[in-house]
A protein has these predicted regions:
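Macrodomain-like recognition of ADP-ribose-binding/processing modules
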Residues: 1-260
Length: 260
């Protein structure tokens, strides 16, 4: 089965699951068809999927992983000041490390906005539908939504990493309060503590709360760097931390702060 056939099959199965999609027209062009599939992945509610669906989905996502390319830690350079710390600008879903961190929302179910350009959306897209189901089961077992500053771990499924650690950072309405700053630090600490508990040696962390959650980037970076440095100085497990940024503004902020 080639990629086009896999996409057509997966869209067909997703249409069968949702009566609202009955009249959905599948585009002819491969690129548009691929976008439609991602949008359907994004909006699919957590539920079990058939073995055949998962098999073909996993094959498709492995093809996509090859097309998009993955980045090995050995190809990156640590910062001159500390060989345990890396700064990398790029798509976190391409990193082949022990764990990547997801800037999640309190449901842990991923971003359900079709084709939205956020890390939560990308991670759930390229991990596969298993990730949303796993997160749903964690919250169901917990009995309440994920509190700000806490963290959960799941397999990474079809991502190059082995695990995804999900954390909910504080959401800022105006300016961050001291409580907000403490909660952001707590998110980083919860992530690192969970990584250590699971013997994770290499971990990539995005700029938590600085996207849709509106935490000021400069202040967030200071909190991130200080919290990570303090933790790994006392950890015998975590060997490598990659600060993952997605834009030039955060890249410049981290470069300056890490050089101090």
């Amino acid at each position: 089965m080639d990629k086009d056939a896999m996409i057509t099959y997966l869209i067909g199965e997703l249409k069968k699951e949702n009566l609202e999609l009955h009249d959905l027209i599948i585009p002819e062009e491969l690129e548009e068809k691929q976008k439609l599939l991602r949008a359907l992945f994004n909006t699919r509610k957590p539920k079990a999927a058939s073995t055949q669906f998962l098999t073909i989905q996993d094959l498709y996502l492995q093809v996509r992983k090859g097309e998009r390319g993955f980045v090995q830690l050995s190809s990156l350079q640590p910062i001159p000041q500390d060989d345990r710390i890396y700064l990398w600008k790029g798509d976190i879903t391409r990193l082949e490390v022990d764990a990547i961190v997801n800037a999640a929302n309190k449901t842990l179910l991923g971003c359900m906005k079709p084709l939205h350009d956020c890390v939560d959306n990308a991670i759930h897209t390229y991990a596969g539908v298993q990730l949303r189901q796993a997160c749903f089961e964690l919250i169901l077992e917990q009995g309440y939504e994920e509190p700000v500053g806490m963290a959960k771990i799941t397999p990474a499924y079809n991502l190059p990493s082995a695990f995804v650690i999900h954390t909910v950072g504080p959401k800022i309405v105006d300016q961050p309060t001291q409580i907000d700053e403490d909660l952001l630090a707590k998110s980083y600490l919860s992530v690192l503590a969970l990584a250590e508990k699971n013997n994770i040696e290499s971990i990539a962390i995005p700029c938590l709360s600085t996207g849709d959650f509106n935490f000021p980037k400069q202040k967030a970076a200071k909190i991130a760097i200080q919290t990570v440095k303090t933790f790994i100085n006392e950890s015998s497990i975590i060997k490598k931390v990659i600060f993952n940024v997605f834009d030039d503004e955060n890249l410049a902020i981290y470069q300056k702060l890490l050089a101090e």
